[in-house]
């Protein structure tokens, strides 16, 4: 799929993160390909995966999951703040010839957030 079509997809994966602590937190939001230990098939490399991300109504992307090293957002979330996300995922059209040969490959994408919270200001 082209980047333009990928970013225009109506179907999105909607989620939010909320800081329920008493201090700001520095976070990394990752989209990882976590393959179950019981899976014995072929795994799709992240170099074929593109994403677009909408954060509180502002759009970012397209981005290659491989090029961003799986970190799709990195920022500060303040106490009691909620950040809303809409994510679109597609296969990179520029790698179309490779993708034609990947019919039996699977991806096991999972969101993971890592955060460090400190009582002092993070501005």
Give the role of each language-model region:
Residues 43-92:
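Signature of Gram-negative chaperone-usher
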Residues 1, 39, 95-99:
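Low-complexity, polar-biased intrinsically disordered regions enriched in Pro/Ser/Thr/Gly
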Residues 3-58:
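Surface-exposed interaction patch
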Residues 7-25, 73, 78-123:
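C-terminal, structured domain-capping segment
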